[in-house]
From Swiss-Prot:
Reaction(s) catalysed (UniProt annotation): siroheme + 2 H(+) = 12,18-didecarboxysiroheme + 2 CO2
Family per similarity comment: Belongs to the Ahb/Nir family.
Pathway recorded for this protein: Porphyrin-containing compound metabolism
GO molecular function: lyase activity
The gene coding this protein: nirG
Quaternary context: Probably forms a complex composed of NirD, NirL, NirG and NirH. All proteins are required for the total conversion of siroheme to didecarboxysiroheme.
Protein name: Siroheme decarboxylase NirG subunit
Organism encoding this protein: Stutzerimonas stutzeri
Keyword terms: Lyase
Enzyme type, top EC level: lyase
EC number(s) stated in the UniProt entry for this protein: 4.1.1.111
Gene3D superfamilies associated with the record: 3.30.70.3460, Winged helix-like DNA-binding domain superfamily/Winged helix DNA-binding domain
Length: 147
């Protein structure tokens, strides 16, 4: 990772410029070209430095529903259950944790009923109980990780 990569990551954590041609504006700001910056983002995704690049939506304002959920998965079944979840379009993230509840994921659906139905489907497919942790309150912390 070079200095341009660091500058790009730091800048993107605050979002793209809200203009007609955001990559061009960002390139001017960082002294590069739009094409170079797009290629850099792709390279950072490809090598695992970045795990995700995309918009953040306020699903409540869009009318959808989401929840944080967890499973307690026997180690011998972990990869198989992870593959089942990854095949579901409602599953946005899926992470291993060192805890009794060792598989954490986010569900996103069009309606709260969709969350209920998806949880029931996961439980039926895996034979495991889903720990459902719906959001009770929204906090905006302005999280930024300087690199």
């Amino acid at each position: 990772m070079d200095e341009l990569d660091r500058q790009l990551i730091n800048r993107l954590q605050h979002g793209l410029p809200l203009v007609r041609h955001p990559w061009e504006a960002l390139a001017e700001e960082l002294g590069s070209t739009a094409e170079v910056l797009r290629l850099r983002v792709q390279a950072l995704l490809d090598d695992g430095t970045l795990t995700r690049f995309g918009p953040m939506f306020d699903i409540d304002r869009l009318g959808g529903a989401f929840t944080l959920a967890a499973l307690s998965v026997p180690e011998a079944r972990f990869d198989a259950v992870a593959a089942q979840l990854e095949a579901m379009p409602e599953v946005a993230h899926n992470y291993r944790r060192e805890h009794q509840w060792n598989m954490w994921f986010v569900l996103g659906c069009e309606t709260p009923q969709g969350i209920t139905e998806t949880i029931a489907r996961i439980e039926a497919q895996t034979g495991l109980t889903v720990l459902n942790l719906p959001k009770e309150e929204t906090f905006h912390v302005g999280l930024h990780f300087p690199v």
